[in-house]
Design a protein with these regions (language model features):
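Acidic donor-binding segment of Leloir-type glycosyltransferases
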Residues: 1-33
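Long helical/loop segments within the catalytic core of UDP-sugar-dependent glycosyltransferases
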Residues: 24, 35, 40-42, 52-53, ...
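Catalytic donor-sugar/metal-binding loop of nucleotide-sugar-dependent glycosyltransferases
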Residues: 155-173
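Hydrophobic, aromatic-rich membrane-embedded alpha-helical segments
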Residues: 312-329
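Basic/Trp-rich segment in TM-proximal cytosolic loops or flexible interdomain/linker regions
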Residues: 179-183, 187-315, 334-342
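Short, conserved alpha-helix that lines the donor NDP-sugar binding/gating region
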Residues: 17-21, 39-48, 155-156
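Acidic metal-phosphate-binding loop of nucleotide-sugar-dependent transferases
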Residues: 62-63
């Protein structure tokens, strides 16, 4: 009797409304119908038709563990200044390689988001089941379209007004995750584009001490990574083509043979007189740090330490595909090309 479920039909063209009507007899379930306007309008419509002290939204492709709600609510009970709590998102029963890679990535995210929660640096409250005090919406307003990343914009807005956001690492919400690389690319393109544009929208609060870790480290680190990824990708491609040209030059000089020896050092720019060893060493350290945080994240979820070879698959494959959506998102941002939801 303490929970009210509001289901919104956002202008569907199938039999969604007929299915929802089967639940209207339940006293704690309210069904609403509106013209299609996008997720943020549907969530706002539900908020406007509710009167509860706490508000949460659950995506259609997600579900929660039985104890998740109770675990998240303890954060509000312990600290009345906590205005939102984010859960840990996990991939349910991955069936494709793409979903398996996301499962490993989300293990890493469990650890990183907990750290951000402790330091006050959370910049996104995930759509699936983040819980807010109603005060957030009465004081700051409802969700905005925000470049199709309303869950990120509301977190930026809350940080701007010094509203505390925490993260409950043992509150698990499961999602299916994109099944194909193409679907994953579209999802991440939207996420990265949203980050770039929301950062630009809230640029006036960046690098200011009064906004704490969020302003000084969390978002700037994301911006640096946006710049570093295409830069590193460029260096890598330069070295690859440089190696190919050296092979061609060698074959032209000594004739064709089957000796494919290639001394690959990444990256090696003689023009800058930079030691290749320093780049290689830094790269190794970064990979080891990511690997360690993935293992720690998995430990937080399962209670057990252990190395999983899927970590290697994730790090190798994502190293090649992640720059694609990062570069495209930055291109879209620079040339004002909006991204679609799907």
């Amino acid at each position: 009797d303490k929970i009210t479920i509001i289901a919104v039909d956002d202008g569907s063209t199938d039999n969604t409304w007929e299915v929802l009507k089967k639940f209207e007899k339940h006293s704690n379930i309210k069904i609403l119908k509106k013209e299609n306007g996008g997720k943020h309008t549907a969530v706002n419509y539900a908020i406007q038709n509710s009167d509860s002290e706490f508000v949460s939204c659950l995506d259609a492709d997600s579900f929660v563990e039985p104890e998740t709600l109770k675990r998240m609510m303890t954060y509000f009970l312990k600290d009345e200044n906590t205005m939102a709590v984010a859960p840990s998102i996990l991939v349910h029963n991955p069936k494709t390689l793409t979903q398996t890679l996301q499962q490993v990535e989300y293990n890493w995210a469990v650890f990183m988001k907990k750290v951000l929660g402790i330091l006050g640096g959370i910049y996104v409250t995930p759509g699936p089941f983040s819980i807010f005090r109603r005060k957030v919406f009465t004081d700051l307003g409802l969700f905005k379209k925000a470049h199709n990343t309303e869950d990120m914009e509301i977190a930026f807005r809350m940080q701007k007004h010094h509203y505390k956001i925490d993260q409950c690492n043992d509150a698990y919400v499961y999602t299916t995750g994109p099944k194909t690389i193409v679907a994953l690319y579209k999802q991440r393109l939207r996420w990265i584009y949203g980050f770039v544009m929301n950062t630009y929208d809230y640029r006036k609060i960046l690098l200011k001490k009064e906004y704490g870790f969020f302003s000084l480290i969390s978002v700037p680190a994301g911006v640096v990574s946006m710049i570093a990824v295409p830069y590193i990708l460029g260096l890598l491609m330069f070295q690859i083509f440089k190696g190919i040209f050296k092979l061609i030059e060698k074959y032209q000089t000594v004739g064709f043979d089957f000796n494919f020896g290639w001394n690959f050092a990444w990256p090696n720019f003689d023009m800058f007189f930079v030691s290749t060893n320093a780049y290689v060493f830094t790269g190794i350290i970064l990979y080891l740090l990511v690997m360690s945080t993935i293992i720690i994240g998995k430990r937080m979820i399962t209670g057990k330490y252990g190395f999983d070879f899927r970590i290697i698959y994730f790090m190798v494959i994502f190293s090649f595909i992640a720059p694609l959506w990062v570069v495209r998102a930055m291109y879209n941002a620079v040339f004002a090309k909006k991204t679609a939801w799907r």
